[in-house]
Regions:
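C-terminal functional extensions of proteins
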Residues: 164-189
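Short, structured active-site "lid" loops
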Residues: 50-70
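Single conserved hydrophobic/aromatic residue that forms the stacking wall/gate
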Residues: 187-198
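Structured adenosyl-cofactor binding patch, chiefly the S-adenosyl-L-methionine
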Residues: 118, 122-165, 169-171
Length: 200
């Protein structure tokens, strides 16, 4: 069973998604171990501030190195995770091959950025690997972290009810899936049976 630790400014946002549906059931059944950690808990100031102005000026704020370093150091004392993944638009674009590689690990730490990004010094110190979910800009790293976690969770034994479910999906076998229909025939559009016949 893999353990995934997510370092974020919004742990409740992550928990809300990860407690539902297939991933939530997989967690409850003990097939995957996921923990969300609030970086603000390591701010070290009364206002729990974790951002600062960028060195050299410019617009926007940057996440400070120290709270991130302290948070991930604390996580490593519990999980001993060798790999830290930073969700970043500058990183390798996520593919199913990368998901399969990460899903084989015993534990992972996923770091969510925010504001204009993260102080590069802490990424270098942690030897963080950068992964992107696409060539576009989001307000934070939480959604990319959830995408990665969801994709990894699906490959863990017991998470999906059917052990063959992931192996026949288009991203897994490299082939596009055919259109999908339900068995209900009472719909104003042509029935699946009629559509199937029209394709023959």
């Amino acid at each position: 069973m893999i353990r995934i630790d997510i370092a974020t400014l919004f742990p409740d946002m992550c928990e809300s998604y990860l407690s539902e549906s297939i991933v939530g059931r997989g967690r409850k059944a003990g097939h995957i171990d996921i923990h969300c950690h609030n970086i603000r808990d390591y701010a070290g100031n009364k206002h729990n501030r974790v951002d600062d102005k960028a060195y050299g000026g410019g617009t926007g704020m940057v996440m400070q190195a120290q709270p991130i370093y302290d948070c991930i150091t604390a996580i490593k004392q519990e999980s001993d995770a060798p790999r830290v993944i930073y969700m970043s638009p500058q990183g390798r674009v996520l593919t199913q091959d990368i998901v399969k590689e990460l899903a084989a690990e015993d534990s992972l730490i996923i770091l969510c950025g925010h504001y204009e990004g993260v102080d590069q010094r802490v990424l270098d110190e942690l030897n963080a690997e950068e992964i992107s979910v696409g060539d576009y800009v989001l307000t934070g790293g939480e959604l990319p972290a959830l995408i990665l976690t969801d994709a990894i969770a699906r490959l863990q034994d017991g998470v999906l009810p059917n052990s063959d479910a992931y192996s026949i999906e288009s991203h897994y076998n490299g082939l596009l899936e055919h259109p999908q229909y339900t068995r209900c025939l009472l719909y104003t559009s042509p029935s699946p049976r009629d559509r199937t016949r029209s394709r023959m």
